[in-house]
């Protein structure tokens, strides 16, 4: 009985942490509400730099032709799922990212 309770407790802790991390990931958007386009290959490194160095996330990569970040700070604007974005999918400038003032 103690073993079952212990396993349930461990599962609950890991599920809670994973659930919380999911809430802080997504496609970051700039001040115009546009995602940062990428085309795999060398742009994957651009996404990593955007997510980690500029936005303060733990990790970033190119996913469905847009940069996707994991463990973003709560003050970074993002969208959760990909769709039709209504922004041009051209080259982007990292300086167009906005953050809420501290």
UniProtKB/Swiss-Prot annotation:
InterPro entries the record matches: LCN-type_CS_alpha_beta_dom, Scorpion_toxin-like, Scorpion_toxin-like_sf, Scorpion_toxinL, Scorpion_toxinL/defensin
GO cellular component terms, semicolon-separated: extracellular region
Annotated SMART domains: Knot1 (SM00505)
Signal sequence, renumbered to the chain: 1-20
Keywords: Disulfide bond, Ion channel impairing toxin, Neurotoxin, Secreted, Signal, Toxin, Voltage-gated sodium channel impairing toxin
MF GO annotations: sodium channel inhibitor activity; toxin activity
Broad class of the protein's primary localization: secreted
Positions of disulphide bridges: 34-87, 38-62, 47-67, 51-69
Gene Ontology biological process: defense response
Record bears the keyword Transferase: no
Residue span(s) of domain LCN-type CS-alpha/beta: 24-102
One family name in Pfam for this protein: Toxin_3
Annotated tissue distribution: Expressed by the venom gland.
Compartment(s) of residence: Secreted
Coiled coil: none
Function: Putative sodium channel toxin.
Domain-related comment: Has the structural arrangement of an alpha-helix connected to antiparallel beta-sheets by disulfide bonds (CS-alpha/beta).
Family membership noted in the UniProt record: Belongs to the long (4 C-C) scorpion toxin superfamily. Sodium channel inhibitor family.
Protein name: Putative sodium channel toxin Ts33
Lineage: Eukaryota, Metazoa, Ecdysozoa, Arthropoda, Chelicerata
